Curated annotation (Swiss-Prot):
Full protein name: Alanine--tRNA ligase
InterPro entries on file: aa-tRNA-synth_II/BPL/LPL (IPR045864), Ala-tRNA-lgiase_IIc (IPR002318), Ala-tRNA-ligase_IIc_anticod-bd (IPR018162), Ala-tRNA-synth_IIc_core (IPR018165), Ala-tRNA-synth_IIc_N (IPR018164), Ala-tRNA_ligase (IPR050058), Ala_tRNA_ligase_euk/bac (IPR023033), DHHA1_dom (IPR003156)
Entry keywords, A to Z: Aminoacyl-tRNA synthetase, ATP-binding, Cytoplasm, Ligase, Metal-binding, Nucleotide-binding, Protein biosynthesis, RNA-binding, tRNA-binding, Zinc
Catalyses which reaction(s): tRNA(Ala) + L-alanine + ATP = L-alanyl-tRNA(Ala) + AMP + diphosphate
Source organism (scientific name): Vibrio vulnificus (strain CMCP6)
Pfam families listed in its UniProt record: DHHA1, tRNA-synt_2c, tRNA_SAD
Cofactor(s) the record lists: Zn(2+)
GO biological process, any: negative regulation of DNA-templated transcription
Encoding gene per record: alaS
Binding site for Zn(2+): 563, 567, 665, 669
Domain remarks in the Swiss-Prot or TrEMBL record: Consists of three domains; the N-terminal catalytic domain, the editing domain and the C-terminal C-Ala domain. The editing domain removes incorrectly charged amino acids, while the C-Ala domain, along with tRNA(Ala), serves as a bridge to cooperatively bring together the editing and aminoacylation centers thus stimulating deacylation of misacylated tRNAs.
Family designation: Belongs to the class-II aminoacyl-tRNA synthetase family.
């Protein structure tokens, strides 16, 4: 019976839904609050706290189709991808889970029913493995299900390994939940080489594991002892690619429908006719991991998750180049992938434009990196004294510039050099070892504080509440009492204190009793409990005491305003920059807010201004901030946006601000948008590739920010004015100096008319103030005489006349300057000894000055 991959996925989820399981959406490829994982690599990752007993959900049975990535860290399939039938960087894990509900018998029965009745796989093609000492599982398979004993294989511990170190015994870490597992294998037939599990030939491809059922029934302590869990659980996983290959009658995962569409599209884009080329498989696999990682917020970078993504992209591009791809090609496969993945690609379709842009930019940048790498490689070859390029240089080219070793080898061979392959492999192995060490769990889960109590939050409508102390912890250990000075965690039965979540910081305040005062400095979630972190300031506090829990209301109010502002900011950014904008993190404090979002370019000043305008417009409209409780599906249908990386219960709080913003949010908010008062962005910048950060303030802090900005502008204006005055003074001093020098030169042009010294001159570039200074200087130098100076500045004529006192009875400066002014289209006058005028006809100035001698002669 043929089934497409999409049909297999839907059949699996529907089957387990019919068995009372809650269908839970695939979680992000970026693990939520789990620093032990680089990427989500199994279906159980999002339920880890449920298995650990730190979280309780509304359901005890769940089923998922989880997107997974294994590349980098402890689980790294990258080097094998494309060269085997079943290695992938990206895959989907179908799973069903029981949290203290059903156990081995039901889990095994469900698996067998789905495989043999829903998928109708031949029973004689299936065989199973159990842990060597798990007689219970063996008997269920043999006696309840009816699998012949010769098709049930017991798998023990690995030779030379530790106890329980077996393919059929699962552990979460060095300590914590663990247990045996049973695996189901499919026999592809005698025509394919390979042996049954547990035989020397088990690595062959005949018998393929398709489903693993893990039975968490023990808690392993640090000393190695196994304690039975009071409520054992079930974690199962079945790779959709493997089961789809069986349902589609093919042997290799790369032959299933999803991969065939991608392989054919790649071949068409790069111009490859050989559809069996392994490079096509590499590209088809890598476009899946790269696209979904970017859609989940990972951006190419040089560290952490971003570095793994960059390596995968470059590996795909390199294989495209090997196939002869011309120009960028990788991003063109995103649309093909979204179509091929069916219902699993709903989020990818929303992010398609962003994913394509990120891939295109990264591929273009890699082209430039290749060019730089070639320069370094050729320089290294030129500097060689021998004929072998050392492994460290080869590794540097690979690790720093993304230069594949095979390309380095090709270039070296063309120039009759060889490369030190052993040295390169050594450097690579050292890097792998570092990655493995970084990816190890190494976590003692028993060291985590476990609280059986469940706190009820009652702080949406109140900041003060009477409550009972249900648990106390000092340095991770539970205690019955606290003494003054103890730094501790207090758990209350119910509390108005909000625990840090969704970017909103935890509340602070006090817990009061008749005999003590506990200062709450922070509030955090601890499983299903709310932990009040702080110090007992005075008195004593004991488990069972009744306290009055009082939240710092003023601080809470400031936080709520900033939290509501982040919702408006998010909506405004999506309007201004585009629907691709998604929240990647936030921090909401009393003092300010910080908002991280996906965007590939710096936000321009004009865009920031428009974002501010939109937010403040919504504040002025004073929308009521409404909260509605509804199921998650109804919230999605309403268009509510979910926060990146957050986990939500079946029932969620939907926060609406008019028709401008609708988001899922469990935080504390203002009553109306008008309460925010004012919104002001204080900074914008990039924090990672494709991730921007905006910091902003609201209310009084926004006014202070605007006032500070205004003061800054005023200071800058005053500084500019002072500088201008200083420059003007300096310029005038220079002009005076020039005038003094010019007057010295003009003395040589003095002539005598009727025994009187006369100076007539045209001086371009000098202003009127400079001319006056020159006239005074010339008078002093001449002792007795008549002076007439003219200049042209900005097409305007300036005139000034000076007459020493002994000659003013015969020649008056005012009459002289007026005579000249009339000839240049102006007029003027002044005292007998000094007068000035202006005119508009600069072309007439030479002839006007030429008439001065005759005019003076007539009057002497």
């Amino acid at each position: 019976m043929y089934m497409s991959t999409d049909e297999v996925r839907n059949a699996f989820l529907k089957f387990f839904e019919s068995k009372g399981h809650q269908i839970v959406d695939s979680s992000s490829l970026v693990p939520h609050n789990d620093p032990t994982l680089l990427f989500t690599n199994a279906g159980m990752n999002q339920f880890k706290d449920c298995f650990l007993g730190a979280e309780k959900r509304a359901y005890t049975r769940a089923t998922t189709a989880q997107r997974c990535v294994r590349a980098g860290g402890k689980h790294n399939d990258l080097e094998n991808v494309g060269f085997t039938a079943r290695h992938h960087t990206f895959f989907e894990m179908l799973g069903n889970f029981s949290f203290g509900d059903y156990f081995k018998e039901d889990a095994i029965a469900f698996a067998w029913e789905f495989l043999t009745e829903t998928l109708k796989l031949p029973k004689d093609r299936l065989l199973v493995t159990v842990y060597e000492t798990d007689d219970e599982a063996f008997d269920i398979w043999n006696q309840k299900v009816g699998v012949p004993a010769d098709r049930i294989i017991r798998i023990g511990d690995k030779k030379g390994g530790k106890q329980y170190e077996s393919d059929n015994f699962w552990t979460m870490g060095d300590t914590g939940p663990c247990g045996p597992c049973t695996e189901i294998f499919y026999d592809h037939g005698e025509h394919i080489w390979g042996g049954r599990p547990g035989t020397p030939e088990e690595d062959g491809d005949r018998f393929i594991e398709i489903w693993n059922n893990v039975f968490m029934q023990f808690n392993r302590h640090a000393d190695g002892t196994m304690e039975p869990l009071p409520k054992p659980s079930v974690d199962t996983g079945m790779g959709i690619e493997r089961i789809s290959a069986i349902m589609q009658g093919v042997h290799s995962n790369y032959e299933i429908d999803v991969f065939q569409k991608l392989i054919k599209a790649t071949a068409e884009i790069v111009g490859c006719e050989d559809l069996s080329n392994q490079s096509l498989r590499v590209i088809a696999d890598h476009i899946r991991s790269c696209s979904f990682l970017i859609a989940d917020g990972v951006m190419p970078s040089n560290e952490g998750r971003g570095y793994v993504l960059r390596r995968i992209i470059r590996r795909a591009v390199r294989h495209g180049n090997k196939l002869g791809a011309q120009g960028v090609f990788f991003h063109k496969l995103v649309g093909v992938l979204a179509e091929a993945m069916g219902s699993a690609a709903d989020e990818l379709k929303k992010q398609q434009a962003v994913v394509e842009k990120v891939l295109r930019i990264e591929e273009e940048n890699f082209g430039r990196t290749l060019e730089r790498g070639m320069v370094i490689l050729n320089e290294a070859l030129d500097a060689l004294e021998g004929k072998e390029l050392d492994g460290e240089t080869v590794f540097k080219l690979y690790d720093t510039y993304g230069f594949p070793a095979d390309l380095t080898n090709d270039v070296a061979r063309e120039r009759e050099f060889t490369i030190d392959e052993a040295g390169f492999e050594k450097a690579m192995e050292e890097q792998r070892q570092r990655a493995r060490e970084a990816g190890q769990f190494g976590t003692d889960y028993n060291a985590k504080i476990k609280v059986d109590a469940q706190s009820e939050f009652c702080g949406y409508t109140s900041t003060q509440e009477r409550s009972d102390v249900v648990a106390l912890f000092v340095e991770g250990e539970e205690t019955a009492t606290l003494s003054a000075g103890d730094k501790a965690i207090v758990i209350l039965q119910e509390t108005p204190f909000y625990a840090e979540s969704g970017g909103q910081c935890g509340d602070s305040g006090v817990l009061k009793t008749e005999s003590g005062l506990f200062q709450v400095e922070d509030t955090q979630k601890l499983g299903n409990a709310i932990a009040h972190h702080g110090v007992l300031v005075e008195g004593v506090l004991a488990k069972g005491d009744q306290v009055t829990a009082i939240v710092d209301a003023e601080r809470r109010a400031a936080i709520s305003l900033n939290h509501s502002a982040t919702h408006l900011l998010h909506a405004a950014l999506r309007q201004v920059l585009g629907e691709h904008v998604a929240q990647k993190g936030s921090l909401v404090k009393a003092e300010n807010l910080r908002f991280d979002f996906s965007h590939l370019e710096a936000v321009t000043a004009a865009e920031l201004k428009e974002v501010e305008r939109l937010v403040n417009a919504q504040i002025r409209r004073n929308h009521a901030i409404e909260t509605n409780i509804m199921d998650i599906e109804s919230a999605k249908q309403k268009g509510a946006m979910a926060l990146f990386g957050e986990k939500y219960d079946d029932e969620v709080r939907v926060l609406s601000m008019g028709d401008f913003s609708t988001e899922l949010c469990g935080g504390i908010h203002a009553s109306n948008t008008g309460d925010i008062g004012l919104f002001k962005i204080t900074s914008e910048g990039g924090i990672a590739a494709g991730i921007r950060r905006i910091e902003a303030v609201t209310g009084e802090a926004a006014l202070e920010a605007i006032d500070a900005q205004a003061r800054k502008f005023e200071e800058k204006l005053q500084d500019a004015a002072n500088k201008a005055k200083s420059l003007e003074k300096e310029i005038q001093q220079l002009k005076d100096k020039l005038a003094s020098q010019a007057s010295a030169n003009l003395i040589d042009q003095v002539k005598e008319i009727a025994g009187v010294k006369v100076l007539v001159a045209k001086l371009d570039g000098a202003d009127n103030k400079a001319l006056r200074g020159m006239v005074d200087e010339l008078k002093n130098q001449m002792g007795s005489g008549i002076i007439m100076l003219g200049n042209v500045a900005d097409d305007k004529v300036g005139l000034i006349a000076g007459v020493t006192q002994d000659l003013t009875s015969k020649v008056k400066a005012g009459e002289l300057v007026n005579m000249v002014a009339q000839q240049v289209g102006g007029k003027g006058g002044g005292r007998p000894d000094m007068a000035q005028a202006g005119g508009t006809d600069s072309s007439a100035l030479p002839s006007a000055l030429a008439s001065v001698d005759a005019w003076i002669a007539e009057r002497l």
